[in-house]
């Protein structure tokens, strides 16, 4: 009777284990049990092969199950559900799939190329460039579907970051509009459009103060560059060059974990650029059209 009780308890534990991971168990002739999990022995007769955890990568603090002896526990990929490959069983895999392998941002969501971005000054389409951009987009979609979409956490995180990025850049670009400037050597840079940009209501008439700032990257760098005047002669001008977002530099992105409300505006709200700039042609006071523009975009 005791032996049967032990056997029942063992079988119950095996049933519980099978809800966590996909296992196969075999009873040996001597009554011991061997357990096979994810292509390897978890229990080989009376020899137990233990699991532990390790970081997903050198840059991630997320944990994954690994064998103490070395090697990943899930050899056939954690971000996949497939009855054909027998990777649709077990709550542990389900949790790992839902969590994902890494943090995501708006950059992980593929952006379909806009045909209008590939038109020249005469309205002719650069078919080759547009085709290459479309091919790259399709490649990124496949990558997204394989590495991000299966994870609900990674998907929501990327979509939320895209929303935050869109709001932050929309507000900032309205308060601090930019323009392209051609330099004397023919290259172009992006600078603050000081003719159209509104100014603050403070004594210094602050210009170019964005509402949402990147913690490690300022919006502009003040510098002197050389341009050509109306007569084609070089002349130096002082500009506020926009510090572009760099996909390879996380600290340069308008992404959720890098954003904060401009501390300078919190200290002195009068610096928020909502007043008319004399160069813009607007009368003194608040730029009503700017406020209406913000509301329309919102």
Predicted region positions:
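Structural signature of extracellular appendage/secretion-system components
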Residues: 1-298
């Amino acid at each position: 009777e005791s032996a049967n009780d032990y056997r029942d308890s063992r079988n119950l534990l095996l049933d519980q284990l099978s809800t966590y991971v996909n296992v196969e168990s075999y009873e040996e002739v001597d009554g011991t049990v061997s357990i096979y999990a994810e292509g390897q022995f978890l229990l080989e007769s009376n020899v137990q092969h233990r699991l532990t955890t390790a970081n997903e990568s050198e840059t991630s603090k997320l944990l994954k199950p690994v064998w103490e002896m070395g090697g990943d526990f899930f050899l056939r990929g954690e971000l996949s559900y497939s009855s054909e490959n027998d990777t649709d069983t077990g709550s542990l895999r389900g949790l790992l799939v839902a969590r994902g392998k890494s943090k995501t941002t708006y950059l992980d969501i593929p952006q379909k190329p806009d045909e209008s971005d590939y038109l020249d000054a005469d309205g002719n389409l650069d078919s080759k460039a547009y085709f290459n951009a479309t091919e790259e987009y399709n490649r990124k979609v496949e990558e997204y579907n394989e590495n991000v979409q299966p994870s609900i956490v990674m998907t929501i995180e990327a979509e939320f970051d895209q929303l935050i990025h869109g709001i932050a850049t929309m507000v900032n670009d309205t308060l601090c509009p930019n323009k392209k400037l051609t330099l004397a050597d023919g290259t172009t840079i992006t600078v603050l459009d000081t003719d159209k940009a509104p100014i603050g209501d403070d004594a210094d008439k602050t210009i170019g103060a964005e509402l949402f700032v990147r913690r490690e990257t300022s919006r502009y760098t003040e510098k002197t560059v050389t341009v050509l005047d109306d007569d084609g002669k070089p002349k130096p001008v002082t500009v506020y060059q926009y510090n572009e977002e760099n996909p390879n530099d996380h600290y340069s992105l308008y992404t959720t974990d890098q954003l904060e409300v401009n501390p300078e505006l919190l200290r002195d709200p009068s610096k928020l650029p909502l007043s008319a700039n004399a160069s813009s042609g607007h009368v003194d006071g608040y730029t009503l059209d700017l406020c209406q523009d913000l509301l329309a975009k919102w």
